[in-house]
Amino acid sequence: MGLLSILRKLKSAPDQEVRILLLGLDNAGKTTLLKQLASEDISHITPTQGFNIKSVQSQGFKLNVWDIGGQRKIRPYWRSYFENTDILIYVIDSADRKRFEETGQELTELLEEEKLSCVPVLVFANKQDLLTAAPAAEIAEGLNLHTIRDRVWQIQSCSALTGEGVQDGMNWVCKNVNAKKK
């Protein structure tokens, strides 16, 4: 009986599963970000034609990340993936200022979706390693993120290529999943 109780204690509690939806326009860096999270090679990334799913362990959670392609023709299918989403991560190419209006419209539509109501949102202001990248504060202002009142949100500067800022964003994700699941 003593050995059995020791074995039970050694067997860690199963990680809590979390469904994360990773969205953003094409070429924002979603797949690079996902591969960075999974510690995979990021030297050969091709546009996502459908979706990628990866499970990443972090802080006692099993994060099931759904990376959905961002091309205009794929975006109408995004809503097929909304069900049971715990966290929305929206990735923006901070250096592609010509598409800020388009990415803002897409984010606004997502925030209005009933199936995503109250779902915490992390906006990754990606590609901060580029000289032309807009700072996260400027992007937050341009997207009027300060007007979001129905959920917790965060904007995080990052570079999916170098990994800078990615872990800070994922720490926020785990903290807010913890708060949501309690």
From Swiss-Prot:
Modified residues (Phosphoserine): 5
Gene3D superfamilies in the record: P-loop containing nucleotide triphosphate hydrolases
Protein name per the record: ADP-ribosylation factor-like protein 3
Top-rank taxon, per record: Eukaryota
Annotated positions binding Mg(2+): 31, 48
Transferase is among the record's keywords: no
Assembly with partners or alone: Found in a complex with ARL3, RP2 and UNC119 (or UNC119B); RP2 induces hydrolysis of GTP ARL3 in the complex, leading to the release of UNC119 (or UNC119B). Interacts with RP2; interaction is direct and stimulated with the activated GTP-bound form of ARL3. Interacts with SYS1. Interacts with ARL2BP; the GTP-bound form interacts with ARL2BP. Microtubule-associated protein. Does not interact with TBCC. Interacts with RP2. Interacts with PDE6D; the interaction occurs specifically with the GTP-bound form of ARL3.
Binding site for GTP: 24-31, 48, 67-71, 126-129, 159-161
Record's function text: Small GTP-binding protein which cycles between an inactive GDP-bound and an active GTP-bound form, and the rate of cycling is regulated by guanine nucleotide exchange factors (GEF) and GTPase-activating proteins (GAP). Required for normal cytokinesis and cilia signaling. Requires assistance from GTPase-activating proteins (GAPs) like RP2 and PDE6D, in order to cycle between inactive GDP-bound and active GTP-bound forms. Required for targeting proteins to the cilium, including myristoylated NPHP3 and prenylated INPP5E.
Gene Ontology biological process terms in this record: cilium assembly; Golgi to plasma membrane transport; intraciliary transport; kidney development; mitotic cytokinesis; photoreceptor cell development; post-Golgi vesicle-mediated transport; protein localization to ciliary membrane
PROSITE patterns: ARF
Subcellular location: Golgi apparatus membrane; Cytoplasm, Cytoskeleton, Spindle; Nucleus; Cytoplasm, Cytoskeleton, Microtubule organizing center, Centrosome
Cystines in this chain: none
Lipid attachment in record (N-myristoyl glycine): 2
CC annotations in GO: axoneme; centrosome; ciliary basal body; ciliary transition zone; cilium; cytoplasm; cytoplasmic microtubule; Golgi apparatus
Lineage of producing organism: Eukaryota, Metazoa, Chordata, Craniata, Vertebrata
Entry annotated with the keyword Manganese: no
Membrane topology: Peripheral membrane protein
Family: Belongs to the small GTPase superfamily. Arf family.
SMART domains in UniProt: ARF, RAB, SAR
Gene Ontology MF terms: GDP binding; GTP binding; GTPase activity; magnesium ion binding; microtubule binding
Main location: Golgi
Organism: Rattus norvegicus (Rat)
Keywords: Cell cycle, Cell division, Cell projection, Cytoplasm, Cytoskeleton, Golgi apparatus, GTP-binding, Lipoprotein, Magnesium, Membrane, Metal-binding, Myristate, Nucleotide-binding, Nucleus, Phosphoprotein, Protein transport, Transport
CDD domains linked: Arl3
